[in-house]
């Protein structure tokens, strides 16, 4: 029910892993042996001896480890792939380009084979008999994957061996390698069994720093009863009703906002849009990887003669599985929220503009709709609704193909809140991001007020999500005859499972969420009490190794979100959250009021746009050039005439216009002329505004709006580099641009000329932020050309004149004429 209309059960089930590092399974039942034994003393002695021996055997029979499959290479001299070191070198290159796609699985070792098992279905993916394993090696701390297990396997049917690489976090690669090597040694008939001792060593090994959690810590469990559902929804509805009549036109007090307030609000919207685009990009890459794996799997099956599964097909089958339905629903919700944000930011972002980004987003939206087998699943996504401004903006912006796709998604994508029945409950939308990031609070709204409203909205959204899952569970028991999902093309959803339900059925399912017209909050509702914040100071630098961890620098002040385990979840001053080991943190006293969590400085760019698919050609005129007034944080200005943006690539930077500048009126006027066809007197409902601006525009009390809001200004000097810059200058410039330590250390050894000589692909190979570095270098080059172009031309003309004068003085008028003719 969390914005999802569903009448069909989901056939996906999650199986929690019971294997954490080391496990075992007995080989036979001791009870049967006891029943078959004689009662003589000799038999009793033999029985006890066998029991002791078999206890060791049962412990060392099977061991299981949770690992991440990184990639598989074919060892071929033609590809310069001969040794494990060659594979690690190629893994580094793939990692630098962002082309490593990990897959969680179970690696199982027994006395006959090494097997790979699907984490969810528990099906065996691959089976490598011990006699086919030619080499086993642990590679520690050689790249960003710090615990790599390498297996070289060659079956009799293969011409060339395969190199399989795994990242091992929970149990380190050197321990797993010892287990496999001992199993291989024992299988060759050695007199002394090595494996029991190896397994005892593994089970007694001190893990050192504990492994990070696989997912953020869960919220405290709460009882979600029918009364709880009604009271929470009543509280939300009462608050919404208290803000104004249902059909009352919008009476926002944006005119009372200071330029600093508006800048802070826009900054946060841009950050949210950044993370939405990142999550959509990640999901699209996931789909593309699944499609590539399915294509390779189909190719192998066509060329295969027998029915026996070939080497590597098990892992390919796992990689070809599409994402679960909940991830598709989350992606569709982020598309809708992204469109709402673009409509709000259309006057504030440029290069590319909001209209360009709309064209860009329709390309992956079309891909996701096709991957689900049609618009049915997207049509079931109710929350968040597009607001009136967004619908008008899309009507004005989209081209013919985009409009056809948009209209095919139905009323949940084309109707604003005012067009839905008043009694129709629309759950609030609280976006959750893959890396755990949460939008920073707006200080001028009052932290307590905004946090209470945010928690209320999140509580209602959680209740709606719980109700939706309960409904799916109930329907799955009633309709057990529904066929399971079997993709026809490896990543397309079966349309007979996800069909759009009628609004009548959806209304019946939401009967528990019927809002009340009462203007007062239910007195039985008790808002969540906020715990006092705790802070810690990092003693050392720590570099994150995966998406759940957080990179921190020495002396960083971090807010502690969860300290119940050995790895603490913390949030830095920029609003990013993740896990760090608790032994690098010192508890500190909370900072003074108002200084606990400052708004992060605005970066003025949406940087991470690395998707390879490009936007359709836009029908709108190009974005206006940036205003001459500098932005709040000084950055080098681009040249007056920006270079044309190629259609096949998405631009790397999105800058926003300075909304607090008095000189930006020209750009705003031009923008208003572009959108003059948009109706300006459209009425909006208050509930629509609640849906549109759930997180960061819930309310601003009139008393709070009258308070003077001060944003501390940072006098950051402008740092530029030239072709003559030293490596120290380059390092300082990289740090001033906010690049991570890996990028600074990798490129900080180059001088200005060397850095300017690198192209985008070379930069991407050197560091993960290569695309962003290239865009900043382009800006620097343009600024240098703009400032030095005229002086260089004058220098060339001066040298030419000196050469002509010298020729004239040496050879007379005739020589001068000859020089002129040339």
From Swiss-Prot:
Lineage of the species this protein comes from: Eukaryota, Metazoa, Chordata, Craniata, Vertebrata
Region labeled Amphipathic helix — which residues? 680-698
Sequence ranges assigned to domain PTB in this UniProt record: 64-194
Q: Region (Helix bundle 1) spans which residues?
A: 718-738
Q: What is known of its domains?
A: The effector region is required for activating the Rac-specific guanine nucleotide exchange factor (GEF) activity. It mediates both barbed-end actin capping and actin bundling activities. The capping activity is mediated by an amphipathic helix that binds within the hydrophobic pocket at the barbed ends of actin blocking further addition of actin monomers, while the bundling activity is mediated by a compact 4 helix bundle, which contacts 3 actin subunits along the filament. The SH3 domain mediates interaction with SHB.
Which residue stretches belong to region Effector region? 649-822
Task: Check the record and name the SUPFAM superfamilies matching this protein.
Answer: PH domain-like, SH3-domain
Gene3D superfamilies attached to this UniProt entry: Pleckstrin-homology domain (PH domain)/Phosphotyrosine-binding domain (PTB) (2.30.29.30), SH3 Domains (2.30.30.40), Transcription Factor, Ets-1 (1.10.150.50)
One of the entry's Gene Ontology molecular-function terms is: small GTPase binding
Q: Residue positions of the PTM Phosphothreonine?
A: 223, 317, 629
The entry's localization annotation reads: Cytoplasm, Cell cortex; Cell projection, Ruffle membrane; Cell projection, Growth cone; Cell projection, Stereocilium
The similarity annotation says: Belongs to the EPS8 family.
Specify where it is mainly localized: cytoplasm
What's noted about post-translational modification? Answer: Ubiquitinated by the SCF(FBXW5) E3 ubiquitin-protein ligase complex during G2 phase, leading to its transient degradation and subsequent cell shape changes required to allow mitotic progression. Reappears at the midzone of dividing cells. Phosphorylation at Ser-625 and Thr-629 by MAPK following BDNF treatment promotes removal from actin and filopodia formation. Phosphorylated by several receptor tyrosine kinases.
InterPro entries, A to Z: EPS8-like, EPS8_2nd, EPS8_PTB, Eps8_SH3, PH-like_dom_sf, PTB, PTB/PI_dom, SAM/pointed_sf
What is the designated name of this protein?
Epidermal growth factor receptor kinase substrate 8
Q: Annotated region Helix bundle 3: where?
A: 762-767
A Pfam family per the record: EPS8_2nd
What is known about what this protein does? Answer: Signaling adapter that controls various cellular protrusions by regulating actin cytoskeleton dynamics and architecture. Depending on its association with other signal transducers, can regulate different processes. Together with SOS1 and ABI1, forms a trimeric complex that participates in transduction of signals from Ras to Rac by activating the Rac-specific guanine nucleotide exchange factor (GEF) activity. Acts as a direct regulator of actin dynamics by binding actin filaments and has both barbed-end actin filament capping and actin bundling activities depending on the context.
- Region of interest (Disordered), ranges: 1-39, 201-225, 298-320, 612-689, 787-822
Where are stretches of biased composition, namely Polar residues? 1-10, 17-30
Identify the stretch(es) annotated as Helix bundle 2: 752-757
Q: How does it assemble?
A: Homodimer. Part of a complex consisting of ABI1, EPS8 and SOS1. Interacts with BAIAP2. Interacts with SHB and LANCL1. Interacts with EGFR; mediates EPS8 phosphorylation. Interacts with MYO15A and WHRN.
- The annotated regions of Pro residues compositional bias extend over 208-221, 618-645
Q: Specify whether Membrane is a keyword of the entry.
A: yes
């Amino acid at each position: 029910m969390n914005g999802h209309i569903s009448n069909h059960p989901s056939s996906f089930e999650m199986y929690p892993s019971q294997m954490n590092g080391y496990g075992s399974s007995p080989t036979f039942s001791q009870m049967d042996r006891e029943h078959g034994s004689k009662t003589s003393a000799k038999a009793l002695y033999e029985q006890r001896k066998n029991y002791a021996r078999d206890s060791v055997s049962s412990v060392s029979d099977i061991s299981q480890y949770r690992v991440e499959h990184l990639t598989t290479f074919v060892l071929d001299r033609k590809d310069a792939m001969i040794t494990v070191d060659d594979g690690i070198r190629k893994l580094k290159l793939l990692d630098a380009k962002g082309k490593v796609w990990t897959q969680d699985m179970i690696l199982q070792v027994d006395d006959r084979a090494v097997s790979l098992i699907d984490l969810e279905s528990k099906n065996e993916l691959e089976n490598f008999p011990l006699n086919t394993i030619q080499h086993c090696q642990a590679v520690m701390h050689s790249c960003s994957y710090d615990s790599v297990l390498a297996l070289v396997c060659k079956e009799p049917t293969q011409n060339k061996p395969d190199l399989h690489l795994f990242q091992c976090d929970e149990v380190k690669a050197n321990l797993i390698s010892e287990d496999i090597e001992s199993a291989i040694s024992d299988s060759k008939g050695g007199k002394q069994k090595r494996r029991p001792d190896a397994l005892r060593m593994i089970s007694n090994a001190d893990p050192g720093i504990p492994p990070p959690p696989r997912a953020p810590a869960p919220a405290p469990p709460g009882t979600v009863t029918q009364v709880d559902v009604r009271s929470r929804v009543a509280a939300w509805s009462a608050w919404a009703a208290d803000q104004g009549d249902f059909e009352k036109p919008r009476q926002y007090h944006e005119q009372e906002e200071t330029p600093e307030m508006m800048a802070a609000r826009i900054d946060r919207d841009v950050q949210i849009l950044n993370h939405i685009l990142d999550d959509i990009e990640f999901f699209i890459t996931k789909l593309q990887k699944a499609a590539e794996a399915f294509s390779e799997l189909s190719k192998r099956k066509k060329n295969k003669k027998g029915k026996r599964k070939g080497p590597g097909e098990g892992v390919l089958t796992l990689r070809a599985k599409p994402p679960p339905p909940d991830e598709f629903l989350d992606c569709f919700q982020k598309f809708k929220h992204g469109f709402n944000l673009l409509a709000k930011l259309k006057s504030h972002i440029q290069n590319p503009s909001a209209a360009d980004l709309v064209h860009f987003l329709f390309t992956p939206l079309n891909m996701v709709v096709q991957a689900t087998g049609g618009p049915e699943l997207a049509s079931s996504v109710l929350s968040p609704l597009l607001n009136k401004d967004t619908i008008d903006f899309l009507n004005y912006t989209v081209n013919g193909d985009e409009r056809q796709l948009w209209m095919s998604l139905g009323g949940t994508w084309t109707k604003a809140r005012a067009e839905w029945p008043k009694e129709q409950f629309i759950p609030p939308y609280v976006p959750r991001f893959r890396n755990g990031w949460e939008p920073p609070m707006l200080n001028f709204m009052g932290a307590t007020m905004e946090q209470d409203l945010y928690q209320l909205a999140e509580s209602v959204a959680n209740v709606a999500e719980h109700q939706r899952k309960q409904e799916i569970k109930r329907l799955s028991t009633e309709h057990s005859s529904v066929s399971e999902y079997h993709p026809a093309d490896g990543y397309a959803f079966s349309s007979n499972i996800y069909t759009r339900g009628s609004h009548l059925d959806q209304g019946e399912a939401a009967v528990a969420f019927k809002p009340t017209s009462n203007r007062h909050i239910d007195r039985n509702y008790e808002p969540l009490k906020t715990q006092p914040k705790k802070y810690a100071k990092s003693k050392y630098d720590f570099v994150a190794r995966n998406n759940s961890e957080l990179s921190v620098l020495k002396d960083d002040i971090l807010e502690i979100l969860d300290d119940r385990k050995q790895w603490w979840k913390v949030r830095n001053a920029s609003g990013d959250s993740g896990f760090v080991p608790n032994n690098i943190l010192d508890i500190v006293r909370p900072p003074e009021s108002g200084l606990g969590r400052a708004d992060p400085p605005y970066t003025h760019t949406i940087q991470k746009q690395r998707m390879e698919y490009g936007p359709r050609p836009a029908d709108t005129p190009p974005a206006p050039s940036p205003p001459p007034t500098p932005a709040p944080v000084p950055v080098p200005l681009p040249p007056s005439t920006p270079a044309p943006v190629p259609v096949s690539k998405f631009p790397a930077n999105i800058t926003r216009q300075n909304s607090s500048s008095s000189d930006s009126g020209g750009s705003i006027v031009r923008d208003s002329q572009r959108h003059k066809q948009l109706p300006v007197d459209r009425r909006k409902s208050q509930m629509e505004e609640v849906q549109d601006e759930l997180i960061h525009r819930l309310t601003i009390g009139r008393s709070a709006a009258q308070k003077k809001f001060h944003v501390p200004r940072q006098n950051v000097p402008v740092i530029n580099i030239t072709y003559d810059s030293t490596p120290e200058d380059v390092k300082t410039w990289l740090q001033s641009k906010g690049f991570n330590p890996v990028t600074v250390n990798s490129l900080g050894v180059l001088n200005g000329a060397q850095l300017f000589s690198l192209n985008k692909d070379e930069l991407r190979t050197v560091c993960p932020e290569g695309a962003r570095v290239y865009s900043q270098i382009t800006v620097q080059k343009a600024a240098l050309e703009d400032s030095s172009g005229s002086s260089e031309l004058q220098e060339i003309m001066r040298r030419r004149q000196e050469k002509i004068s010298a020729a004239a003085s040496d050879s007379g008028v005739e020589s001068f004429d000859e020089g002129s003719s040339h």
